[in-house]
Amino acid sequence: MHYRSREVEQVRKIAYDCDVLVIGGGIVGLSTAYAITRAAPGTRVTVLEKERGPARHQTGRNSGVIHSGIYYRPGSLKARYAVRGATEMVKFCAEYGIAHAVTGKLIVATQRAELPRLHALVQRGRENGIPVRELVAAQIAEYEPEVRGLAAIHVGTTGVCDFVAVARQLAEESGAEIRYGAQVLRVDRRAGLGVAVRTADGAVVRGRVLVNCAGLYCDEIARMTGDDPGMRIIPFRGEYYELGRPELVRGLVYPVPDPAFPFLGVHLTRGIDGGVHVGPNAVPALAREGYGWGVIRPREVGLALSWPGAWRMARRHWRYGGGEVRRSVSKAAFTEAVRRLLPAVTEGDLVPAASGVRAQAVLRDGTLVDDFLIREGERAVHVLNAPSPAATASLPIGRAVARRVLGVLGG
C-alpha cells in the first residue's frame, strides 16, 4: 500500500508542469518568482505574461520614482514595504548595474490650507523612520530655484530608477520559465491538487499553486479561479507631458496630496534619462488598458458600471473627478496645475508623452482600497491591489507572497 501511494505521488509529480504558476510578468509577478526561487531553490516556477515582453503596463508606464514611504499610514503594508523596498531597490540596482539615482524630493505647499497637511506628512515621515527636513519659503530655492511655495519638506531617500530593467533582471535571476504571449483564458482548480491554466494559444499549464499578479486584470483572474475577490479594478489613466525646458527642474517636486485619495497629484520628475516628466493626473479610463480617450472596450466599461462600488465612488468624489477630467481635456487647465509649483512653465513647454493606467481596487461600498491587498484562496494567492508604490515595494511584496505560496506547498 505504501509503495502504491508513493507511485501515485510520482505520477502526480510528472503531471505538473511546475510547482508555482505565476500569472503576470510585471515587476510584482517577477519579484514573486525571484523570491520563491531564492527562498526555496529547486522550486519550479512558470510565469505567464500575455504581452511579448515584461513590464509592459503599470511597471513600465509610471514616473520611475523610488518612493520613500512618507505618504503611507504607519504600520500599513505600503509604509512597511515602501520604506524597506526603497533601500532594497537601490541596493538591487547598484548590484546589477541598473540605472538609478537617489535624488531626494520636495513636497511643496502652495496654499495655506495645505500647511496642516504638510505638517502631518512630517509627523508621518518621522513615524515611518524617514528623515525629513522642513523648509520655509525662502529655503525652497536651495533645492529648486524655479519652484515657488509657502513651505516645503525635503525627503532625502527618494530616488529614480529604470523599473523595466529591474523587471528584466528579476526575470533572469529568478531562473523561472517565462512564457510571453501567454494570455490566460481559463483557470480550472481541483481541490487539493492544484490548477490547470489554458492560454490563448491552446496550451495548458498545470501547477500546484497559482499566484495572481495580473495587475489590471487581477480581479478577473481571481473570479476565473473561483474566488470572490470582494473588489473590482477600476482603471484610472495617468497622463504625462515631457517638459520642453528640463533645466527648470533639478530633481523631484510634488504637491501636497489630498489624503482622501490614493493619488499624489501632478508632479515634476527628473528621470534617469535626464528628461523631466510632468504628471500624472487621474481620470477614469474607458478600458483597462485605455491609454487614451480613443481606447474604449464596451465589455470592460460594462463591468465597471455593473459594480455598485463604482457608482458610490463617483457620487462621493464627483467634484475631484471633474477637475481631473478638465485637466485631461484642457492643456491650459493642466498647465495651470503645474504653474502652482513652477510659475515659469508655459503651455508650449509641455510636450505630450506616454500615459499609464493605474489598477485601483474599489470595494462594493465605493471605498478606494488604500493599502496593498493580498488574499488567499484554495491553492491560490491573489495580489488584488498593488498600484504605487508597488514598484518601489516589489521586493518585499514578492517575499510576502512567496511566504504564503511556500506555506501552501509545504502544507
Language model regions located:
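Glycine-rich FAD pyrophosphate-binding loop
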Residues: 37-61
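Helix-loop-beta segment of a Rossmann-like dinucleotide-binding subdomain
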Residues: 15, 99-109, 121, 134, ...
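Dinucleotide-binding Rossmann-like beta1-alpha1 core, especially the glycine-rich loop
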Residues: 64-139, 149, 265-267, 275, ...
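Short beta-strand to alpha-helix junction loop
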Residues: 73-84, 108-117, 153-171, 179, ...
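Flavin-dependent oxidoreductases
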Residues: 31, 187-296
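C-terminal catalytic lobe of FAD-dependent flavoproteins
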Residues: 263, 293, 311-411
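Helical element adjacent to the flavin cofactor pocket in flavoenzyme catalytic cores
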Residues: 153-209, 213, 217-220, 393-406
